[in-house]
Amino acid sequence: FRHCPFNDLRVVFLGYDPYPNLVNGKPVATGLAFANHKETIEERYSPSLRVIKDSISHYLSWDKGINFDPSLEKWEKQGVLMLNSALSCSRGITGSHSLMWRPFTRSLLENLSSFKTGLVYVLLGSAAQSFEQYIRQDFNFIIKCRHPAYYARTHTIMPNIWKEINDILISQNGYGIEWFNQFKT
């Protein structure tokens, strides 16, 4: 919430819960859904983040020389809120705090979708899609897709939600999200 002010908000990604594991004694979770730490090298991206990057690369035909920020902070600065339906979990136990966070997430989505219209909500996976009923659909847009972990398990490419998001944003305010920062020199 800190780097994505309410007035600048354009897209809300909703995932499941933070990564429950540690790598080299450091939590993988960063506070942004699907993000990895900035210093994470590509070979060590979490499976979900790798699927997201590969999907964007596939559909945008940028298969080399791209500059992808694994922290996803560049997206956040463009008005993309990377949110999980649960904001914590016990180490090593996926979904362990999901019931505890459900009322908070429900209230957040109800209020957000009522007071900030024209947002694109991207619901990734069945846990996120269970919150669809709390989003005002008369003034907002909803895109649903399987969770990136599914595509990691099946070794398949996510659908082109990136173009769909940008098409909506461009029709609303003339510009989309820059998913990749720029070409490396």
Residue ranges of model-derived segments:
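A polyanion-binding, active-site-adjacent surface
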Residues: 1-135, 141-144, 150-153, 159-168, ...
